[in-house]
Curated annotation (Swiss-Prot):
Entry keywords, A to Z: Hydrolase, Manganese, Metal-binding
Cofactor(s) annotated in UniProt: Mn(2+)
Residue sites binding Mn(2+) 2 per the record: 215, 226, 333
Organism annotation: Staphylococcus aureus (strain NCTC 8325 / PS 47)
Name this protein carries in UniProt: Uncharacterized peptidase SAOUHSC_01816
EC numbers for this chain: 3.4.-.-
Pfam families: Creatinase_N, Peptidase_M24
Length: 351
């Protein structure tokens, strides 16, 4: 079943006339055309008969024509009302309720004479949850480049270097490999500074005998990677090394349980139980992982409350962590493809 036919099925299920998609990444997912329109309207209209209409600034029309998109294009000037160029009466319209602003919704009511709205968010999330072979190949390459980032960062470690200096070195050096954008702000944290799960790199200088936490990802052809390694610099304290070994055991055990048909919450429980049994449960304050694709965090989440089942074609992260203030912060994260037989680990830097 194609992406568009899945949307049409949802239109029929909700007795709606069309779907209105405005999240730039979702528009790209359906059209193959990527734009960051800022305050301008950029939207895809999918009608029940399968017709697709892309609304975009007129200055982008030629780029759209050169893209894989084959539907109708409505290009508008900044001084024009886009809706006046494509007058429609749409009784019920499905929207991304998690994204669309109230102001845009009011424009739809007046522009398309919309009487009622439905939600298309979950349908799109479910579509994006299962990756095509092309998407998987791009994520695999993004993961390979993330491995290279860790290698670059580790090779730059030396006593006295600051966290920000390591971040800058990674992000500048990886450009030599064709990377123009990171998935998110690169995180490099030294010692007990890593006890803050989402800490911000600063001017802290590296000392001997502490751990260094790297959390980073790159974007390759619009698709993200996201990995974490915690690396020894010298010989950290006995407790810090004990924490590392517990996190590694939790991650390894969780990954080995991955296969289609297993509830996501069961994977979380495996890692969480190991950490709790070793006395560090209160220091593991977040879910085990999340979906990965066009965004570094996307549907679904690997959490203790998610009863949905793993399916072949999903790409998820597994990232247990223990964060003890004043002692250490350790997280280990890999990108995992769910296969028909079980799983494939896409990130490979040594642990």
């Amino acid at each position: 079943m194609t992406k568009i036919s899945k949307i049409i099925d949802e239109l029929n299920n909700q007795q709606a006339d069309a779907a209105w998609i405005t999240t730039p990444l979702n528009v790209y997912y359906f059209t193959g055309y990527r734009s960051e329109p800022h305050e301008r309207l950029f939207a895809l209209l999918i009608k029940k008969d399968g017709k697709q209409v892309l609304f975009c600034p007129k200055m982008e029309v030629e780029e759209v024509k050169a893209s894989p998109f084959t539907g109708e294009i409505v290009g508008y000037l900044d001084t024009e009302n886009p809706f006046s160029l494509y007058p429609q009466t749409i009784n019920k319209l499905l929207i991304e309720s998690e994204h669309l602003t109230v102001a845009r919704q009011k424009q739809l009511i007046s522009g398309f004479n919309v009487n009622s709205f439905g939600d298309v968010d979950l349908t799109i999330k479910q579509l994006r949850n299962i990756k095509s072979e092309d998407e998987i190949s791009k994520i695999r390459k993004a993961a390979e480049l993330a491995d290279k980032c860790i290698e670059i960062g580790v090779s730059y470690l030396k006593e006295g270097v600051t966290e920000c200096e390591v971040v800058n070195h990674i992000e500048q050096t990886i450009k030599q490999y064709g990377v123009n954008e990171m998935s998110f702000d690169t995180m490099v944290l030294f010692g007990d500074h890593a006890a803050s799960p989402h800490g911000t790199p600063g001017d802290r200088r590296l000392k001997s005998n502490e751990y260094v936490l790297f959390d980073l990802g790159v974007i390759y052809e619009h698709y993200c990677s996201d990995m974490t390694r915690t690396i020894k610099f010298g010989e950290p304290s006995k407790e810090a090394q004990e924490i590392y070994n517990i996190v590694l055991e939790a991650e390894t055990s969780a990954i080995q349980a991955i296969k289609p048909g297993i509830p996501l919450k069961d994977i979380d429980h495996i890692a969480r139980n190991i950490i709790s049994e070793k006395g560090y449960g209160e220091y593991f304050p977040h879910r085990l992982g999340h979906g990965l694709g066009l965004q570094e965090h996307e549907y679904q989440d690997v959490s203790s409350t998610n009863s949905n089942l793993l399916e072949a074609g999903m790409v998820i992260t597994i990232e247990p962590g223990i964060y003890v203030p004043g002692v250490a912060g350790v997280r280990i994260e890999d990108d995992i493809l769910v296969t028909n037989e079980g799983y494939e680990v896409l990130t490979h830097y040594e642990k």
